[in-house]
Structures are given as C-alpha cells and as structure tokens.
Amino acid sequence: MEAERRCQAEKPKKGRVGSSLLPERHPATGTLTTMVDSSAPPCRRLPGAGGGRSRFSPQGGQRGRPHSRRRHRTTFSPVQLEQLESAFGRNQYPDIWARESLARDTGLSEARIQVWFQNRRAKQRKQECSLLQPLAHLSPAAFSSFLPESTACPYSYAPPPPVTCFPHPYSHALPSQPSTGGAFALSHQSEDWYPTLHPAPAGHLPCPPPPPMLPLSLEPSKSWN
C-alpha cells in the first residue's frame, strides 16, 4: 500500500517537471497583440517595395515624396517676339552661338530661346498639316479641276525631212596634166560645172561646197632641147 501511494505521489511531480520543459504560452500577450493588429488601419504595400519600412504612415499619408512644383511660364514682350520671329524666318534650327547672340539681344536666357524655337517648329508643322488635311480627301480628278486649262499650240511641228546630199563632183579620178596651166583650166571648168546642178527641192538642204581642189601637178613643164 505504501508503494502505491509513493507512485501516485510521484506522478504529478513528473508531469510538472515535463511541463516546465515545454515553452510557456502567454494567452494574455497574444490577446493583446490581436487587439493591436485589429485596431491599426490596413496598409497596402507597393509590389516593388523591399522589406524595409513602409512608405505609408498609419494615418495614410505618404512619406518622402516632394510636392510637385508649378512650372513658371515665360511671357514675351512684343519686341522680343518680333526679334524671335525674324530669327526664325532666317534659320529654324539655330546653333548655340546664334542662340547666345539672340539671348544677348532679347535679354532672355539661352534655354528659354531654345524652348521657344522648339515650340515654334511644332506650331509650324501643325499649321502645315491643317492646310494639307482638306486636300487629302480630294480625288485626282477634282484636284485637276483647280489647274488652269492648257491652251493648244496654234503651230504644228513637223520633223524636218532627211537631208539628201549630191555626189561629190570630184569623186572620180582625174588624169594627171603635164603642166600647171592644164590643171588650172580643169579646176576652173569644174567650178563652172558645179553651179549647173539642179537646185535642191523644197525641204532639202544642199551639201556644203567642196574644198578647193589642189593642182595635181605643180612641177613646171620641161622644155625639150
């Protein structure tokens, strides 16, 4: 009987020792944590945010983002606009030296002048597109009606007829003459014969006159002793 009592008395002690080795739970602390979590407003984290601090405060405001600055718009005087327009008419793409020279004349900064030229080129392209847009819907026949009618030429052009040349009068071989007198007489006779040719018909051009014929024999005649 005494042994059984000792065993029953030792069982609760063993349970207490085993339970002391297990981690103790704090239900009160867990309850407090759930209350704090439920009272805080839900915060959404950005998809690309890291594991650091949240970018949003519990009140819903965003931290670290600067306020957007309002751009200052430059107003140009009529004198400045006149100078800029005249420079734009001369050159639509001025270089850095031209912009600096224009900045000294107008009293503006070089950056402001560069922006003005960019806006002016964009405005001109927009105006050109607005002018060409109504003409894009016209057909070729309607567009040709705006062109002036071409008047027919009162004179008709006919190609000239082919030029016919007569045979050269000196193409045949001439016999050699023993003296210069005979050669001179022959050349004179041939010159008299050339104008006797029939005149060229209308529309045909005669060949240019032949070059003067050189005498075939220039040696003086030998006297027989």
From Swiss-Prot:
Q: Give start and end residues of each DNA-binding region.
A: 69-128
Looking at the record, which segments are called Disordered? Answer: 1-76, 197-225
Keywords (A to Z) from UniProt: DNA-binding, Homeobox, Nucleus
Localization, UniProt: Nucleus
Matching InterPro entries, A to Z? HD, Homeobox_CS, Homeodomain-like_sf, HTH_motif, PROP1
PROSITE patterns (UniProt xref): HOMEOBOX_1, HOMEOBOX_2
Domain of life (superkingdom): Eukaryota
Basic and acidic residues biased stretches:
1-12
Provide any one GO MF term from the record: RNA polymerase II cis-regulatory region sequence-specific DNA binding
A Gene Ontology cellular component where this protein is annotated is:
nucleus
- What SUPFAM superfamilies does the annotation carry? Homeodomain-like
Q: Where is composition skewed (Basic residues) in this entry?
A: 64-74
Q: Where are stretches of biased composition, namely Low complexity?
A: 215-225
Where is this protein primarily located? nucleus
GO BP: pituitary gland development; regulation of transcription by RNA polymerase II
This molecule's function is given as:
Possibly involved in the ontogenesis of pituitary gonadotropes, as well as somatotropes, lactotropes and caudomedial thyrotropes.
| Assigned protein family | Belongs to the paired homeobox family.
Instruction: Please state what the protein is called.
Output: Homeobox protein prophet of Pit-1
Species of origin: Gorilla gorilla gorilla (Western lowland gorilla)
